[in-house]
Amino acid sequence: RAQRRWGISAQLYSLRRAGDDGAGDYTALAGLAAQAARRGADAVAISPTHAGYPALPEHDSPYSPSSRRWHNVAYLDCDAVPGADVVRRTNGAAADVAPAPDTPLIDWPQVLPRKLRRLRACFDAWRANGEPSRDAFEQFRAAGGAALDAHARFDALQAFCIEHGIGADWRQWPAQWRMPATAEVDAFAHAHADAISFHTFLQWCASRALGDAQQAARDAGMAIGLIADLAVGSDRAGSDAWAHGTTLLRGVSVGAPPDLFNADGQAWGVTTWTPAALRANGFTPFIDLLRAAFAHAGGIRIDHVLGFARMWIVPEGGSARDGAYLRYPLDDLVRLVALEAARHRAVAIGEDLGTVPAGFRERLGAQGIAGMRVLWFERDADGAFRPPSAWDRDTIAMTSTHDLPTVAGWWRGVDLAWRRVAAGAAAKTATPHPAGDDVGRAAAAHGSAPDERNDPVLRSDAPATDDGHDTPPPASADLRAPQAERATDRAALWRALQHAGCAPAGDPIPSADTPPVGAVLAYVARSPSPLAIVPLEDLLALNEQPNLPGPPCGHPNWLRRLPRAIDALFDADVHTRIAAIEHARRTAEDDA
């Protein structure tokens, strides 16, 4: 009889720990994994750790990375990198003071530059003191080869161009700097070898820190450990696009067609390989990416795995409605995922939500790639929630995702108020979800734009974002209809909870301001799935979701921090919810 496991999902940036620099980091991740393992969790699915832009802190979307192969150095713990102990002995307490512990949102333009200053001091001290880890660094650098060198060159060159007023977007740089292998870039690298070594050092530190987090998870007893998130593409103005030239799609954005959930479709502002380039290069770029993702994880989640079959391509400057499908070699890609998962003894999960081609899920399943089943979409044609026993086997069961409402937020209708705000913003946009050029323009479904930065209430009609509130948003003329529909949906979910034995049969439905989070978590955990994943936002019964798909509307995408530090997350209420999850998982085993 197969064991029914459970895990959590976490937005890495949102984690808190004592002494952090104002944002989540790899040390907090290791601590969270160990804490969750001690409570019975077997996995921690994390937001992408792809490389961002060290010189462009306002570009904060984890799904619009500079490079998918390399790591995000913004998540480094400055006190845990080589050289940090030397800096402490030399300088004493750090001069830079971190934000107050209760800061609700990350202020990246403050946090990241300060962190880079501290990391630079550690690098200088480490190099000056001739530490024995120098050999490990050189081995990492040699193993990374030309690809690592190109990424470090990009980060150094971008910082130089920003500092000298040339701009962050490599497509606007002087022609001789628009690709890595030119004599002029070689000359820059020679003149700025120190900066390039620093950026290489940061990648080495990030690789070590992720490896340490996975080791902490396994040492604490997790069967899987970290589940890395593989974004669908990389930013068109980033390191990958600069280094890989014509092997990536140009003049278009990857996105999704209009559907029931996004009437205008989506253009995400990212690019990926052309099908021809993948074949011509023997799929080597894809294999390298998979190996990088599996290197420090017990599994991967592939964002928008539907793109393995066909990718919705949107013309630059056009709307997502102007897009068309570009076909990809599905069977080759899924076989390579299966091969690398087997080589790394890891699990592979495909985010298969959206417009799914006929037979697609069966082809994924045949190669051992598990799809995702999310509570909000597990409904019959009449609106009834499907009982857990009817959920697909060999898939991953989830209450929600980063793009969807939390359980508490859905029950209270918080998402309805935000959807109204987002719809108003979309109506004021001349071209919905444009696939523009600007560096830092976030994917419509996966990011935030500069005018949202650190401010959840830029628009006067934005709903409250305090997770402490315990009343639903007030009804307005344009909210009464969706709120009435939500009341019907709450009743349907409550009936489903009762029929599944997750809520007392004779109890009346809880009010809109009393979400039955524990019962809902147990309901999802009752599915026959081998792994149920619970977002931390649901384990903590928070109201707000990490990201709101759509145009900029004041929602603080990818900026919210958890309300408590990792050492204080698992309080009595959370323990009660975990007990309900574990009981439901055992019940699912007995029903198998």
Map each language-model feature to its residues.
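Active-site-proximal loop/turn and secondary-structure-junction residues that shape catalytic pockets
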Residues: S14, H50, L230-R236, L306-M311, ...
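Conserved alpha/beta catalytic core and glycan-binding cleft of carbohydrate-active enzymes
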Residues: A136, D352-D437, D466, D470-L539, ...
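Active-site cores of enzymes that catalyze phosphoryl transfer or operate on phosphate-rich substrates
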Residues: E131, F137-D186, P258-T271, P275-R301, ...
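Intrinsic, low-complexity polybasic segments
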Residues: G440-H446, P450, D455-D461, T471
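Active-site-proximal helices and loops of the catalytic beta/alpha 8
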Residues: P62-Y63, Q214-Q215, G233, A237-A263, ...
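Acidic/aromatic-lined carbohydrate-recognition and catalytic surfaces
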Residues: R1-H244
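Hydrophobic faces of well-ordered beta-strands that scaffold small-molecule active sites
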Residues: W6-A10, V44-I46, L226-A228, I300, ...
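Low-complexity, glycine/alanine/valine/leucine- and proline-rich hydrophobic stretches
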Residues: L540-L569
